[in-house]
Amino acid sequence: MDRARTETGELNRFFNWAYRTRGNTVKALAEGKMMSPEKMFLSFTSHDPVFISNGPEGLNGSVKGIGFIPKDEYLEEALAAYVEHIKSYDPEDKTYSDRGLKLLIKWLYSEEAEKTIDFEHIYSVEMAFKHSYANYKANPEATLLFYQPPMLSFEVRGKMEIIGEHHEIGTADPFSLPLIQQFINAQHDVYHLPNIERWVSRPAYKFTVEEIFDNSANKIGFGTKIPF
């Protein structure tokens, strides 16, 4: 059985929150539903944990965006769909982001897509190349800390792997990068302003989940370990 799921087959409470909160927001946007700013901002807490690291730059915490991706055997097909969409970008085309949302639903957040998701890992891209980057190059131990006011909080411990290198734009072929580095950057660009040439400057983070704790201020939290 998938370690992210309980004995009933349901996602455990961390993944149910982290994956489905983001997915529900994407679906709502794709359907044109209005979301209050407060609800929108709260939904981002499942996407923007604090990355905790410790190394030559000292004990550090940095807020970064995260995401889930399909398992290895589905990546090439999904990447091809992403790239086809990205290459269709036209500054005058106001439908680009809406079409991107539909792609994200197809490959990440549909009922069928959920069966293909890699819940063993959490992914991100590096854009700053300061404290976190230096620390993870020296020491892969990492904790991701999530907090949604007023009381929900999860602590996820594991190991961080840096996929790819930080190249100057124009010095490397984006399509020669490691598959995961291409995919994470493409997944970002499916909705946001795309720039394929920029991918070479943004290595990916692959965080292997080892332990999950519910630190929420409620009767099932306060450091309770979630089976995984």
Predicted feature descriptions by range:
Residues 1-228:
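Binding-site signature for planar aromatic cofactors or substrates
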